[in-house]
Structure formats: structure tokens, C-alpha cells
Regions:
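Lipid interaction determinants
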Residues: 1-61, 67-144
Length: 144
């Protein structure tokens, strides 16, 4: 399926309700391969993450929230070799049947986030129950 076809299907799909977004992310970590992970805690909607860009480690602390319209956002203060920066990152989710589409807002390309058959290649398979971010984040914070 081409990117244009995925975009067309996503445009016809419905926004995922807030309850559905919450179920997908609550107390789960989104694993970013070797490049980091972000944890979406239920308690105080805390967001904790670590990243690695070209071998340079960094971390982020903040909150995550659901502004409606199928959106998930996290606002964090990021700390790294290049200094500190505040950032707001949002993703939009749309659903048609059991298929969920996702894109980074404002202008990311749509892709299949979760297939109807839960394909192992789906990005959703990288969203795991539990905290896979805080331990690494704490190790990064502890380095002089």
C-alpha cells in the first residue's frame, strides 16, 4: 500500500475516542528501538523518556494528555548534550474497523499504527505494558 493510499484511508477513518487512546498508552512504554523509550504513567499523567541520538544520551520529563480528536500529546523538558529545551509533541490517531492509523502532528505522514491482525511490524507492537524508560533515564541523570 502506498503512502497516498494510507493517507486516503486515514482521512476517511474516525478519530479514536479519548478512552481508546488512554487504553493504548496508560502505564505503557513506547519503545523507540535503540534510540530510546517514553513511559506514559497513569499517576499524575507523568511522561518520562530517554533518547540516544548519534550516541549522545538525553532524557525528558513532563506530562502527557489527550486534547481530543484522537490526539495524544506529551510536553517535556528535554536535557542533553546540546542543552535543555522544552518541546510539545503530538500524534493523531484514526480508526477504521480494527485498523488504527497514526501520524505526527502537524504534518507527519499517516501510517498503519495497528493492523487488524496485529502484525509484528506494526508500530503498536513497540508499545509495551510497563515502565521501560525510567531506569535508563535515571542512569543518564546520574552520569556526571
Amino acid at each position: 500500500m502506498t503512502a497516498a493510499q494510507v493517507a486516503e484511508l486515514a482521512s476517511q477513518a474516525e478519530a479514536v475516542p479519548d478512552a481508546g487512546i488512554y487504553q493504548m498508552y496508560q502505564n505503557r512504554s513506547w519503545l523507540w528501538g535503540q534510540n530510546g523509550a517514553g513511559f506514559f504513567a497513569v499517576q499524575r499523567r507523568q511522561f518520562s523518556a530517554w533518547t540516544s541520538d548519534k550516541g549522545k544520551l538525553g532524557y525528558g520529563d513532563g506530562i502527557w494528555f489527550l486534547p481530543g480528536g484522537g490526539k495524544l500529546c506529551f510536553r517535556a523538558k528535554w536535557h542533553g548534550a546540546g542543552g535543555d529545551a522544552d518541546a510539545l509533541t503530538c500524534f493523531e490517531h484514526r480508526q477504521a474497523g480494527r485498523v488504527v492509523y497514526q501520524r505526527k502532528i502537524p504534518d507527519g505522514d499517516w501510517y498503519v499504527f495497528r493492523s487488524s491482525d496485529r502484525n509484528m511490524a506494526d508500530e503498536f507492537m513497540k508499545v509495551k505494558y510497563g515502565d521501560y524508560a525510567t531506569w535508563k533515564q535515571n542512569r543518564i541523570k546520574a552520569k556526571p
